[in-house]
Every structure is written in C-alpha cells, then in structure tokens.
C-alpha cells in the first residue's frame, strides 16, 4: 500500500476510496493501522496530547439521546445542577497538577442558559489567570452567537459539540434535536474564532457507510479536534444492550479517521478502556490525543497507567503549552 505516502504528499482520499479501504477484508487491520501511523508520525511525531473532563452539571437534560445515561429517560440519583465556580476552578488546578494540556468543562442539557454562561465565563477568567497556558474547552450543548462571543471573550479556547453519528443515522439516535442543530453550533463557534472540537460515538448500530460519512462530515466541518468515542452501553438506555465492537474493529475505525483527516487532532475518548481493552496502546499509532481520568458518568483508568502506556510506546506527552518543568514532573510521577 502507498496510501500514507500519497496523503503525506497532499492527496485526499475520496469517500469511495475510504470506504473501500475500510471495508476490504483482504486489508489487514494492522496494515491499515501502519498506514495511519505513517501519517500520524509525519504530522505529530510521537507526541500525545492530554485532555481532562469535568462534569460540571449532570443528568438534568430534556434530550432523548439513545446512548446517554443522563438523558431524560434516565432517572439518575446523582443528578446535580451547575457546580460552584470554586469547584470548576479546582478542577482546572487538578488538571494543571496532572500535566494536562486541555481542560474541558462539560454540562448536561440541551444548551446553557445565559446565567449558566455567566457562571462559566467567570470561572474561565479565573482559570486563565491562574493557568494562562492551560487550554480551556467548553462543552455546554447547543449555543447561540451571543453566548459564543461571551465564551471567546472570557478565554475559552475550544468548544466541543459532537456530531455523534451520521446525518443519515441521526434520527435513530436522538429525536429531540436535529443533525443541523449540531452542525450550526459548531459553525457558530468557528465564526467566533473558537477552535471547533467535534467527534463521534461508534458502536450504536451504524453501518460502515455511516462511519465513513461521519469521517467526511467532520472533514467538511473542518473540526480541529476529533474525539472518537466507543459506545459504553449503559443499562436502561436505548443502546444499553448493544455489543457490536471489538478491539480490532475500534482500531480500524481510528485508522480510517486518521487517513481521512490527516492533519487533525484525533482523540481516543469515552469507552476506550472497555472496547479497546488490551489493545489500547495500538490506538495511539493513529490517534495523537487521549482523555485521562474519568469521563462524564463512567470511570477511566488511573492517570499513571496512561502515562506509562505512552512511555512504553516510546511516545511522549505533548508539553508544548505546558510549564517548562512538566516533563520532569511526569518522570517523577512514573518513578514514584
């Protein structure tokens, strides 16, 4: 195969070519992953970006997303409103202490109220004062122009709003908002010079064509960062009994997303531990970014395990926007 060589030299795969690569059973997954690694290495070397999530508001949501344990159909006991500013700031302090490059503040719900945006912006201003090098990502749901402008002014660097699935499959996943609603929010953030982060959830019953459509939709949207989540089935949700992924299938998905979006930050995100299992390290041959710590309502593995995984691969944490002593602190953590 010379796919990687062509891409590195400026060639862009067509949708049909990507589909053929992804579905051709004569192409071994590790062969495809090797092509993805060549592309990843060309653009990002062996560096890995670290991201951390704070669940700032949980379970209070009118939406019916079929994958989500915080949807309107789930009567969770651990629901809570937007947490105090001090707790949001404390989360950022913890992120900085753990050598994290991007701190993501996440809220459940359809979208933020203006009062909630005020709350977030005040928190972000203090975070930026304390940790000017820490990138702040907001994930607050559907947002409007005025809210985007205020978030930008406060110092928000990135906004996450996932497409989650293909346009064709969207209404099978959720009915309380449209695919176009999601695209519009990402476009609004771009118009306000906030870096767009948008990704997918795989393993919800979508087809191979849906996955290729997702990869190209994100390419067209020009998302700077693409988190790839793998369904972690939650009992009681629409997809709570779904179990169609294997570690090798997950690796193939990550590989094709890299080949379609060669220059973008591709992150292995929610569900990586339960779906990739012992093959987690191989995902970083195509992806160049991970979430560390816990997710929204499911647990992750200890940070030190991720640091060790990166080190064992011969890779290194991307410290480009972190304090100068970050690399030394990581080494001290691993040797402790």
UniProtKB/Swiss-Prot annotation:
Q: Might you give the EC number(s) for this enzyme?
A: 2.8.1.6
Keywords associated with the record: 2Fe-2S, 4Fe-4S, Biotin biosynthesis, Iron, Iron-sulfur, Metal-binding, S-adenosyl-L-methionine, Transferase
Q: Which residues participate in [4Fe-4S] cluster binding? A: 61, 65, 68
The chemistry this enzyme catalyses reads: (4R,5S)-dethiobiotin + (sulfur carrier)-SH + 2 reduced [2Fe-2S]-[ferredoxin] + 2 S-adenosyl-L-methionine = (sulfur carrier)-H + biotin + 2 5'-deoxyadenosine + 2 L-methionine + 2 oxidized [2Fe-2S]-[ferredoxin]
**S-adenosyl-L-methionine recorded as keyword:** yes
Q: Which GO terms describe its molecular function?
A: 2 iron, 2 sulfur cluster binding; 4 iron, 4 sulfur cluster binding; biotin synthase activity; iron ion binding
Q: Where is the Radical SAM core domain?
A: 43-269
Biological processes per GO annotation: biotin biosynthetic process
* Family matches, as CDD domains: Radical_SAM (cd01335)
The cofactor required is: [4Fe-4S] cluster; [2Fe-2S] cluster
Check the record and name the Pfam families matching this protein.
BATS, Radical_SAM
Question: SMART domains attached here?
Answer: BATS, Elp3
Q: Pathway listed for it?
A: Cofactor biosynthesis; biotin biosynthesis; biotin from 7,8-diaminononanoate: step 2/2
Q: Which cysteines are joined by disulfide bonds?
A: none
Binding-site positions, [2Fe-2S] cluster: 104, 137, 197, 267
Cofactor descriptive note: Binds 1 [4Fe-4S] cluster. The cluster is coordinated with 3 cysteines and an exchangeable S-adenosyl-L-methionine.
Q: How does it assemble?
A: Homodimer.
Q: What does this protein do?
A: Catalyzes the conversion of dethiobiotin (DTB) to biotin by the insertion of a sulfur atom into dethiobiotin via a radical-based mechanism.
Protein family (similarity comment): Belongs to the radical SAM superfamily. Biotin synthase family.
Q: What is this protein called?
A: Biotin synthase
To which species is this protein native? Staphylococcus carnosus (strain TM300)
């Amino acid at each position: 195969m010379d796919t990687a060589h062509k891409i590195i030299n400026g060639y862009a795969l067509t949708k049909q070519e990507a589909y053929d690569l992804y579905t051709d059973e004569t192409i071994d997954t590790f062969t495809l992953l090797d092509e993805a690694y060549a592309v990843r290495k060309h653009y990002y070397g062996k560096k890995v970006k670290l991201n951390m999530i704070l669940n700032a508001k949980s379970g209070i949501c009118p939406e019916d997303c079929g994958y989500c344990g915080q949807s309107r159909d789930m009567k969770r006991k651990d629901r809570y409103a937007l947490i105090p500013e001090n707790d949001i700031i404390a989360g950022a302090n913890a992120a900085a202490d753990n050598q994290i490059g991007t701190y993501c503040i996440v809220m459940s719900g359809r979208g933020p109220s203006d009062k909630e945006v005020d709350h977030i912006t005040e928190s972000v201003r203090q975070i930026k004062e304390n940790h000017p090098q820490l990138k702040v990502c907001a994930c607050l749901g559907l947002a409007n122009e005025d809210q985007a402008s205020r978030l930008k002014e406060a110092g928000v660097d990135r906004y996450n709003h996932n497409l989650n699935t293909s346009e064709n499959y969207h209404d099978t996943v959720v009915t309380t908002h449209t695919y176009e609603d999601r695209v519009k929010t990402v476009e609004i953030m771009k118009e306000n010079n906030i870096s767009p982060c948008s990704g997918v959830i795989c393993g919800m019953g979508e087809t191979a064509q849906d996955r290729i459509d997702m990869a190209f939709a994100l390419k067209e949207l020009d998302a700077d960062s693409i988190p790839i989540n793998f369904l972690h089935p939650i009992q009681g949700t629409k997809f709570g009994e779904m179990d169609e992924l294997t570690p090798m299938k997950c690796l193939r998905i990550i590989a094709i997303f890299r080949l379609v979006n060669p220059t973008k930050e591709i992150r292995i995100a929610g569900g990586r531990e339960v779906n990739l299992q012992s093959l987690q390290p191989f995902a970083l041959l195509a992806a160049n970014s991970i979430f560390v710590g816990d997710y929204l309502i499911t647990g992750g593995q200890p940070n030190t395990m991720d640091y060790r995984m990166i080190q064992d691969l011969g890779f290194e944490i991307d410290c480009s926007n972190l304090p100068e002593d970050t690399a030394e602190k990581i080494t001290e953590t691993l040797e402790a």
